């Protein structure tokens, strides 16, 4: 089902990134020469995808309830194959994208038939956490355990390997532990949302967060399933590119 369109939207506006600042803001020069300030949902370091002077794509959505009418959605970067490629950098999109992927049946082989999907469901030992997606298998499924899905937007890469995280993430560490905690009564699935089409594998970003890498390997040993999903980002939509294999450790060349 590679090539399946999953999301479509009004064509994005292209421009040139001037700078990002205060974590949430980016100044961008549009094609007509005007400059706008856009909201940047990705507050991390954006390793490898934050390049002043690069082409970017913005969504224009003016609203009385929004301070900024523009949102930074995509960035053009050098790809693993030497060609330029577009990367989805809006961290608000992956949960919606993975849900659309499941609903389209692209992960039927890995997850089975799914009867229902719930988002942001409270769970955890102290009931203070929320799982991104909670799936209920169909009545015909042999394995009736609920499926807890944690989604991670992944934009950093070295060579053709996608890496997460690109900085220390105590929140991400906590999510791995919580996935392990639901086993074996439920299935636990970590889905790295590979928001660039040029990668052929996924690995934990050990060089950015060694503790996360350690917990990632513990999670694999405990039975947490890792299902990297790859996508192509275009000006007017997002297309399914298939799953990618998960590696237990960041390639040595990148450490």
UniProtKB/Swiss-Prot annotation:
Coiled coil: none annotated. CDD domains: SfsA-like_bacterial. Transmembrane segments: none annotated. Pfam families: SfsA, SfsA_N. GO terms for molecular function: DNA binding. InterPro entries: SfsA, SfsA_C, SfsA_N. It comes from the Bacteria. PANTHER family: SUGAR FERMENTATION STIMULATION PROTEIN A. Belongs to the SfsA family. This is Sugar fermentation stimulation protein homolog. It comes from Synechococcus sp. (strain WH7803).
């Amino acid at each position: 089902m590679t090539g399946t369109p999953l999301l479509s939207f009004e064509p994005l506006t292209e421009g040139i990134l001037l700078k990002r600042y205060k974590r949430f803001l980016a100044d961008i020069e549009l094609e007509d020469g005007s400059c706008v300030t856009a909201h940047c949902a990705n507050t991390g370091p954006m390793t490898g995808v934050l390049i002043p002077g690069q082409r970017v794509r913005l969504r224009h959505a003016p609203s009385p309830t929004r301070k900024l009418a523009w949102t930074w959605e995509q960035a053009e970067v050098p790809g693993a194959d030497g060609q330029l490629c577009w990367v989805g950098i809006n961290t608000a999109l992956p949960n919606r994208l993975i849900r659309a992927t499941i609903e389209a049946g692209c992960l039927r082989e890995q997850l089975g038939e799914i009867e229902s999907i719930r988002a942001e469901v409270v769970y955890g030992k102290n009931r203070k956490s929320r799982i991104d997606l909670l799936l209920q298998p169909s009545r015909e499924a042999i394995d009736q355990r609920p499926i807890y899905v944690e989604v991670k937007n992944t934009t950093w890469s070295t060579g053709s390997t996608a890496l997460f995280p690109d900085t220390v993430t105590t929140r991400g560490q906590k999510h791995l532990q919580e996935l392990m905690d639901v086993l074996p009564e439920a299935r636990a699935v970590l889905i790295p949302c590979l928001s660039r089409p040029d990668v052929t594998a996924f690995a934990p970003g050990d060089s950015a967060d060694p503790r996360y890498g350690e917990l990632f390997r513990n999670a694999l040993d405990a039975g947490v399933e890792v299902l990297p999903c790859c996508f192509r980002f275009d000006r007017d939509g997002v297309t399914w590119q298939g799953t990618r294999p998960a590696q237990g450790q960041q390639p040595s060349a990148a450490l």
